[in-house]
């Protein structure tokens, strides 16, 4: 169960969604939460990273935490029903569900779940995420999983959508080399700073996406203590893979650009498995970002 607590210690003056300890994910599992500005390519990054982990022989579970429920369609090649949709069909009697009702097998055996969310303007997405993890534990679906990836809605870092941070070992932030994306990244760093006081989550690093250059990201990283873990340029093959509803690992093997992107995802996955050193980054004030970024 999830409850709302007043003024907890993990965010000054904030109201956060606090998870029941019984829904914690096993310690030996690598849990990654992927955040970033809305539309920056988090789902593409998450799905290709899941595919890369599977290529390295890992058992992978990807959990989409967006009411749009489009996180996993390149893995499953279709839009799958959400946990909320399935629970509504059984009047929220979760004991009536079977794993195959809400977990779908995707590319190379990656297990896919879409938590969904409440209707617009109602409810709490964090509650839905918590209930999804609880349901997975009830069916013992996390016991044989090596890697769990949470693909989280936009750059929303309220108590609800910060809920995946309570399960994660690392947070990866997807950004482009522009002001708006980096501004959103700074807000996410602030959320990690708050959650890290009471939870195990730490910053893993930055994924530069859809960017030929990284000069602005590099400025921000140097100032805050972040690092770039992977760099994906604006490669047309990535866009085409979304249109084909597949991962980059299912695209043309003879395309050199495809091969380069695959290698970068495999390198990122291996680095995360090698117990990447967590970062102690410090967020900037809004005015400091305005002064920092841009051309001299």
Curated annotation (Swiss-Prot):
| Similarity field | Belongs to the NifH/BchL/ChlL family.
Its function? Component of the dark-operative protochlorophyllide reductase (DPOR) that uses Mg-ATP and reduced ferredoxin to reduce ring D of protochlorophyllide (Pchlide) to form chlorophyllide a (Chlide). This reaction is light-independent. The L component serves as a unique electron donor to the NB-component of the complex, and binds Mg-ATP.
- Indicate which residues the UniProt annotation says bind [4Fe-4S] cluster: 124, 158
Q: Look at the named UniProt entry and state the broad enzyme category this protein falls under.
A: oxidoreductase
Q: Report the NCBIfam families cross-referenced here.
A: DPOR_bchL (TIGR01281)
Output this protein's name: Light-independent protochlorophyllide reductase iron-sulfur ATP-binding protein
SUPFAM superfamilies the record matches: P-loop containing nucleoside triphosphate hydrolases (SSF52540)
Q: Does the keyword Oxidoreductase apply?
A: yes
**UniProt cross-references to InterPro entries, sorted A to Z:** NifH/chlL_CS, NifH/frxC, P-loop_NTPase, Protochlorophyllide_ATP-bd
Pathway, per record: Porphyrin-containing compound metabolism; chlorophyll biosynthesis (light-independent)
Encoding gene (name): chlL
GO MF term (any one): oxidoreductase activity, acting on the CH-CH group of donors, iron-sulfur protein as acceptor
Query: One biological process GO term for this chain?
Result: photosynthesis, dark reaction
Assembly with partners or alone: Homodimer. Protochlorophyllide reductase is composed of three subunits; ChlL, ChlN and ChlB.
Q: Does the keyword 4Fe-4S apply?
A: yes
Catalyzed reactions: chlorophyllide a + oxidized 2[4Fe-4S]-[ferredoxin] + 2 ADP + 2 phosphate = protochlorophyllide a + reduced 2[4Fe-4S]-[ferredoxin] + 2 ATP + 2 H2O
Ligand binding (ATP): 39-44, 68, 209-210
Quote the Pfam families the UniProt record gives: Fer4_NifH
Q: Which organism is it from?
A: Synechococcus sp. (strain WH7803)
What is this enzyme's EC? 1.3.7.7
Q: What residues bind Mg(2+), as annotated? A: 43
